[in-house]
């Protein structure tokens, strides 16, 4: 059974991924890829997870995406067109123009639709995971090891809440960018999976490491991600006066790791009291830009900007969570029968900062391994007896949408200003007070209100925001995408290789 809160199954972060997916071109090696991942991760990567991804990930891309699903990656001559992205030693990124995620996801969904035994539940929001200790009507189940036995689901169209039992449950709920004021993520990236897993008792890992994409187009409609590949192909970043400043922050300038570029842009904006910086690729031939980046060219024109004509305004935006629900090599969490894959999980691959275009690769490999492990488990094990869960007891107080909207504004502004690119003890202390009070208010609101997707999202959002805040507050070491003003430098700290657990 595939469950998604979206009305269209394709609505996800994967669908909007632009740059590409890491594979293995001629002359590259697993060792070199692993080295690049570890360098970007700033010493916090799990070496075994990195080696697994570097060794098996590119082979799976070739086997599943290229040969079996025939994703139409761009070609050049007799081979593929490989692109270079920031912090990569070689050009090793496969892409489909500048809209790589969409054709990959379409191919995977089409393959799922061909399987007759897959049931689809769209417009269905998970309320909570079901556990033996909390949801079983048998009081002796509380003495069993923590075990997930399914989920409670809300049918958005009818408002009905029902329990669905499962021998294996896999979280693939994506990211949490919507808890920030500026984000490249779609509306559904509210941290739902993080919050549900935490309420069920799963261990969380490294949630302070939030990667901010350096370049999101500034527009009242929202923030449009401007792919890393633009800078890989020669785009430059300037301030309002037209000055390139990234060389002062890192020798690789525009091709430096994302956290370095994002902080440098943010700092420049603060120093100059400017609302945005500028990205410029207009020195390239216009036809080449339109051919290489057709999707971005089209989307930018819809927003009133022309990539081929001159610089366009950009800001850093919350983009990817390097942490999440702690998982092993097969996606198993610390709760029995619960697995996780993709951005909701923390496999240890990304460490303190993710290398560009490795997210699709990690999601592909860990999704493959988690699915295979779950299938083996289902074939070899059964629940020891039928499980009966407690019935849902609904409340019926109408939900005021103005309260939900205002609470989201408080969450997003607080996270952006105090738990964002630049963090300090004073900022984090203030954020803790604001978010803590708001959590209590939202929890009371949730317990009284009529169940809805919007109310669930708000509850999950505040709980995820507080989990990020706690991890950031506990970790005084500036490392990768977690930057503490006046914090300890990672290189001089004994915590350099220590993960932050919740």
Regions found by a protein language model. Name each.
Residues 45-56, 92-110, 121, 183-191, ...:
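Short beta-strand to alpha-helix junction loop
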Residues 168-224, 357-369, 373:
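Glycine-rich loop(s) and the adjacent beta-strand/alpha-helix scaffold that form part
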Residues 6-38, 42, 221-227:
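Conserved N-terminal glycine-rich FAD pyrophosphate-binding loop of Rossmann-like flavoproteins
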């Amino acid at each position: 059974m595939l469950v998604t809160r979206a009305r269209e199954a394709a609505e996800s972060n994967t669908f909007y991924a632009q740059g590409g997916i890491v594979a293995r071109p001629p002359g590259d090696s697993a060792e070199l890829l692993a080295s690049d991942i570890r360098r970007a991760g700033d010493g916090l990567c799990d070496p075994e997870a990195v080696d697994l991804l570097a060794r098996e990930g590119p082979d799976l891309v070739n086997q599943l995406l290229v040969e079996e699903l025939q994703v139409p990656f761009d070609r050049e001559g007799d081979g593929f067109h490989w692109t270079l992205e920031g912090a990569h030693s070689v050009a090793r990124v496969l892409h489909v123009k500048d809209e790589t995620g969409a054709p990959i996801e379409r191919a995977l969904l089409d393959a799922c639709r061909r399987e007759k035994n897959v049931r689809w539940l769209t417009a269905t929001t998970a309320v909570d995971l079901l556990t033996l200790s909390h949801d079983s009507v048998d009081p002796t189940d509380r003495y069993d090891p923590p075990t997930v036995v399914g989920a409670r689901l809300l049918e958005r169209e009818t408002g009905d809440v029902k329990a669905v039992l499962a021998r294996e449950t896999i979280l693939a709920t994506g990211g949490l960018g919507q808890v920030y004021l500026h984000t490249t993520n779609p509306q559904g990236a509210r941290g739902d999976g993080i919050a549900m897993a935490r309420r069920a008792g799963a261990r969380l890992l490294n949630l302070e490491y939030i990667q901010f994409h350096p370049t999101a187009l500034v527009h009242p409609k929202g923030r449009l991600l401007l792919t890393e590949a633009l800078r890989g192909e020669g785009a430059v970043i300037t301030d309002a006066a037209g000055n390139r400043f990234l060389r002062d922050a890192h020798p690789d300038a525009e091709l430096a790791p994302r956290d370095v570029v994002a902080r440098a842009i943010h700092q420049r904006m603060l120093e100059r009291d400017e609302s945005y910086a500028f990205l410029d690729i207009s020195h390239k031939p216009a036809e080449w830009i339109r051919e290489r980046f057709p999707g971005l060219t089209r989307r930018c024109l819809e927003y009133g900007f022309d990539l081929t004509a001159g610089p366009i305004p950009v800001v850093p935006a919350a983009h990817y969570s390097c942490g999440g629900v702690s998982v092993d090599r097969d996606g198993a969490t610390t709760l029995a029968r619960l697995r996780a894959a993709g951005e909701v999980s923390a496999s240890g691959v990304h460490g303190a900062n993710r290398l560009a275009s490795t997210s699709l690769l990690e999601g592909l490999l860990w999704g493959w391994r988690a699915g295979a492990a779950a299938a083996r488990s289902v074939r070899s094990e059964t629940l020891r007896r039928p499980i009966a869960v407690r019935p849902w007891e609904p409340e019926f107080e109408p939900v005021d949408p103005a309260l939900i909207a205002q609470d989201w504004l408080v969450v997003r502004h607080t996270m952006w200003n105090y738990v964002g690119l630049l963090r300090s003890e004073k900022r984090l202390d203030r954020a803790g007070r604001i978010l803590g009070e708001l959590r209590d208010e939202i929890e009371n609101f949730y317990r009284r209100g009529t169940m809805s997707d919007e109310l669930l999202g708000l509850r999950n959002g505040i709980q995820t925001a507080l989990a990020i805040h706690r991890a950031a507050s506990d970790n005084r070491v500036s490392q990768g995408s977690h930057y503490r003003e006046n914090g300890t430098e990672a290189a001089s700290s004994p915590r350099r290789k220590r993960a932050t657990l919740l």
